[in-house]
Amino acid sequence: MAKGIMTYDVGEQVDLHLLIKSSTKGIASNGKPFLTLILQDQSGDIEAKLWDAKQNDEQTYAAQTIVKVVGDIHHYRGRNQLKLRNIRPVAENEQIRIDDFLETAPIPKHDMMDTIMQYIFDMKNPNIQRVTRHLLKKYGQEFADYPAATKNHHEFVSGLAYHVVSMLHLAKSIVDLYPSLDRDLLYSGIILHDLGKVKELSGPVSTTYTVEGNLIGHISIMVTEIAKAAEELGIDSEEILILQHLVLSHHGKGEWGSPKPPMVKEAEILHYIDNLDAKMNMMDRALEHVKPGEYTERIFALENRSFYKPTFHE
């Protein structure tokens, strides 16, 4: 099996196929155009610059294009970067599939969906259970395949479902410790809090924001979806309002994207669980690529900090 791009050390030469995750045009200080390419395989992704880009390069090296690259790994501003020596699109006769380059959740998606459905079946509140089942059935296929984000955390195939499963397991332990929490409400809030991302994001490959995602966002999308589900199911109860509040407030603060701060216990706990699982995923994935005694690349979403892997973890 070919060595993954994230396993290369600084100074090593790279000669392998990669998938262009994103391609952004820029203008250098000398006035010449260049492309910033994010190149990925199943081990992760890395940035590369294509300098002095020609007029047709923007189309040739667009997102979702598989390329053969030769270059060297450099360290730049706290992160590894691929310095390109040569790059070309793959030929049709090379028979390489996009799926070969996609990072996926470590648990099969069918197993994750079975786990989530079991949490729904265990709910005792019929109104909460019906709305949750209705929405998961409506968007189940996309939910099982989509990433949880375009970057930072769980940004891989089935990352959304993996994020939710981890959060549900955390919630179960927390509710066992603090039984005054409404188990059904918290479970439902976890399952639905990011479900709007199936409309906010374009899909599991070269993920970008849709027009609806840019203009409305996953929080507002899901608040509307909960209201529509309740109307279709003939449910008119306070549970719907509180469930909408959990979705609205799960980012915690206005400056983090929530129109309202958490104002019920379960909303506060949902915010903490979401934040904890996202940060653990960021740290774990960064630490996978360093040896004991080394520091990770800087993690932008964690105040641009680097994390150290202790030597006694060898």
Curated annotation (Swiss-Prot):
Any one GO MF annotation of this record: 3'-5'-RNA exonuclease activity
GO biological process, one term: rRNA 3'-end processing
Keyword tags: Exonuclease, Hydrolase, Nuclease
Annotated HD domain residues: 163-279
Pfam family, one: HD
Enzyme Commission code: 3.1.-.-
Keyword Nucleotide-binding annotated: no
Enzyme category, top tier: hydrolase
The keyword Hydrolase appears for this protein: yes
InterPro entries xref list: 3'-5'_exoribonuclease_YhaM (IPR020873), HD/PDEase_dom (IPR003607), HD_domain (IPR006674), NA-bd_OB-fold (IPR012340), YhaM_exoribonuc/phosphodiest (IPR050798)
Top-rank taxon: Bacteria
Function statement: Shows a 3'-5' exoribonuclease activity.
Family: Belongs to the YhaM family.
Protein known as: 3'-5' exoribonuclease YhaM
Species name: Bacillus pumilus (strain SAFR-032)
